[in-house]
C-alpha cells in the first residue's frame, strides 16, 4: 500500500512538474512578446491546479489593465500544447484618464497559444466576449455581449489590422458578417447582416488624447435589430437609414444625436387609426383597418433625437401613413424606459386637413398609454369638420 501511494505521489509530482515546465515555456514566450511590443508588466504569476497565467498592472502606449488572466485547457497542456480557452481583463483603460474602465471576459474554443502569438489568427467554434463598464454608458446600458462562430485576425501589417467575424451577434441580436480595419487612432467596422435587400452599417471610432468620437450609420438596416443593438425599446419595425454620433471624454459620454428615417414598417403596440376613427369624421376602408387591433403601418417615420444625460430628446417626429400625417416631439427616459410623446395627427384627406388631433403618449415605451388633448381649438375644428361633411 505504501509503495502504491509512493508511486502515485511520484506520478503526480511528475505531472505537475511537466505542467510547470509547459507553463514556464508559455511564460517565456509571453515575456518575449511583451518585450517586442514594449509592454510593461509589474509581475507574472503561474497557477498549476487550474492551469493559468496572470499578469499584474499592464501598461502600454494604447491601453492599461489592472490584471490579465489567461486560462489553459488541462489535457492539451499534458501533451505539450498550451491551448488557451479563456481570458479575463480587469479594469481595462484605453487612456490614462479613463474614468469608466471595463472588465472584459473572453471565452473561446481552445486553440494553440502558438497560433495566438502568430501574425495571423483563426478562431472557430463558439466564442463569446462580455464587456462590462463600471458605470452605464447611457441609461442603464453598461454591459455588451458579443459572440461569433469564426474569426480571422491579421496582424501581419502595422499600418492596418483587418479583423473578420462570421455569424456574429451583439446583445443576442444576429448581425451576420463584420469586418474591422484599424489604422493609427481610427477603427472602421463594416456590418453586413442578413436581410431582404442590400443593407449595411458602418461604425467609425476615432480617439485623440482623452477625446473619442463614434459615428454609426447605416442604409436599409432592420429597425428592430438596430434598436436591440442600442438597447432601445422595441417600438418600430421596417428598415431604416440612420446616422448616429456619440462624443466621449475620458470614456464618459458627453453628447449624442441621431437622425433616423424608417420606411415601410409598423409602430408596434399602438394603432393610431383605431384612435383617430373615434374622433375624425372619416370613413376608413377594410384594408386600412384590418390590423386595427395590432400596430400602425407607416410609409415613413422620421426621428431627430438628442441624448441629454439619461434622456433621449425627440426634437422632431414626422409620420406618414396612407391615411394619416403626424408631427410631434417627446422624451424617452432611458433609465426607466418610459416615454412622454406629443404628436399632432392630420388626415391625408384634403377635406379634413384643417382638423388636427393632439395625442399624448406616456408610460412604458413598449406598451404606452395615451390621452386625447381636447383643447378648445380642437373642438372648434371638429365642429367645422362635421359641418363640412354634412353639406
Swiss-Prot record:
Claim: Membrane is one of the keywords in the record: yes
Keyword terms: Membrane, Transmembrane, Transmembrane helix
Spans through the membrane: 4-24
Membrane-topology descriptor: Single-pass membrane protein
Record has Membrane as a keyword: yes
Superkingdom, natural source: Bacteria
Subcellular localization: Membrane
UniProt protein name: Uncharacterized protein HI_0134
Predominant cellular place of this UniProt entry's protein: membrane
Any single Gene Ontology cellular-component annotation: membrane
